[in-house]
Amino acid sequence: MRSFNLNIAGYKIRIESSEGGPELVPAERFLRNICNESDHDVLIRVHAGKFTIPGNAEKVFNAPYIEEINGIQVKKSDRFWSIHKYQNDLFIKTLFPLSLKSKKAILKYSLNSSEWDLWIEGGGAEVDPLEYPLDGLILYYLTVIHGDIMIHASGINSAGNGYLFSGVSGKGKTTMAKLWDNSGARVIHDDRLIIRHTGSGGYVMHNTPVYRNDVPLQSPLSKIFLIEHGKKNELIPVNGSGCVSMVMANCIQHNWNTEIIAGLLGSVSIMCPVIPAFRLLFKPDKSVIDLILKNE
């Protein structure tokens, strides 16, 4: 196809192939986010071939390629993606480590513009313009622009109550999602969520397409649990600056720009007094669900 529109976490994304550009073939995980809406928050034009970042652009961030093997993070390469700044423009330069083709891409974007450009080199006649890691990077910078929060967390909805379970890798996000799923709750996602303010004082958590069979899901956010494995189940209320710092520690953030960091800090600081938060030490069985529901 030459163009398509997506709605992911309420962000309206239009992707168009430029004149002479490649055919656009989004991966299966995005198909259920395709929509017919004509307006958009951001337009991304896709070009084939090489693009050269201005020579005097400053590299402001570099991300190595890290794989998780048996719960341990292992650096596989120093080269993955990087961010470069030239005047008011930003550039993401990336490789595609999961691709069968040896290709690379550059995304030109601005936090003050709704029109971005993407050049894919070595992709052939057909490309997925949202191939990993571009999907997460595009969504992250949309959260920055809109003052939202992207966080490492699983989320569920039980009887209308939305619970978010946040923690770094290995703390039990997926385990918690499975426990609730087995208890009949709706799992919003087990790994990554976007939290958006509703404009009327509340918050909604959204999933994003990560797995092949993902469908768009959202839930009002009722409580936040900062999780870790324990010998017994224990709920400890957290608030104030302690709550803000614990939530911030699990947020996805690029720390190269003080304004971006300040914006995220502001968003989390506004949310924490509104949404009750707890440290949750838990045993990986149904008893933790009983504890949470008992304290509802």
Question: Can you say where each PLM-predicted feature lies in the sequence?
Answer:
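Conserved glycine(s) of the Walker
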Residues: 171-173
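Hydrophobic positions on the alpha1 helix immediately C-terminal to the Walker A/P-loop
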Residues: 176
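A noncatalytic interaction/capping subdomain that flanks phosphate/NTP-handling catalytic cores
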Residues: 1-164, 168-169, 179-186, 193-296
